A protein has these predicted regions:
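Active-site-proximal or metal-binding-adjacent scaffold patches in catalytic folds
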Residues: 1-110, 119-168
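Walker B catalytic acidic pair
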Residues: 115
Length: 168
């Protein structure tokens, strides 16, 4: 349970979100042709961003995107830094993404998208992996990977019984 704004907000969906996003990330690892309920489309293969400078350039590009700025008009600067001795990536509300560079999975685009979505949706009044976060994640996935990947992510959330907030 995280403290936000002086009160405890339970992040009850976190493990379900991680499971849904792990399935989605594995599909992006493979990329290629996907048959999805009778429709066939091609998924991109996610990149492995090998170092902090590549991750920072990627995040800077996303921050400068008019498409993401129009969806998330209050985006501030964001710094990507390394994280040692930890096995998880995380977002810090003061505009920092911390990546454990010694963990190969942490350098995948989907991990950076996840942490960037926290930056887009951060609120002291909502759970970190709640519906507003999931909405941001789908929007960022659509921008980075395309509509097909965003559709698969939304379906993974739906399969896990997770609501995605509507745009406000």
């Amino acid at each position: 349970m995280a403290m936000r704004g002086g009160s405890a907000i339970k992040d009850q969906d976190r493990s379900l979100v991680y499971s849904a996003e792990d399935l989605w990330s594995k599909a992006l690892d493979r990329g290629g042709v996907v048959n999805f309920f009778g429709s066939t489309f091609t998924l991109p293969q996610q990149k492995i961003l090998g170092d902090l400078s590549a991750m920072q350039r990627t995040v800077d590009f996303w921050l400068q995107s008019k498409a993401l700025q129009s969806r998330f008009p209050n985006l501030g600067p964001l710094v990507v830094r390394g994280r040692k001795g930890e096995r998880k990536a995380h977002y810090e509300p003061d505009g920092v993404i911390a990546i454990p560079l010694d963990q190969p999975w942490a350098c995948k685009e989907a991990v950076l998208v996840h942490e960037f979505a926290h930056h887009c949706a951060w609120s002291t009044d909502a759970p970190a992996h709640g519906p507003a976060y999931r909405h941001a994640m789908v929007e960022v996935a659509n921008f980075v990977f395309g509509a097909e990947a965003a559709l698969l992510l939304r379906a993974a959330y739906d399969g896990a019984g997770l609501e995605v907030a509507d745009a406000t």
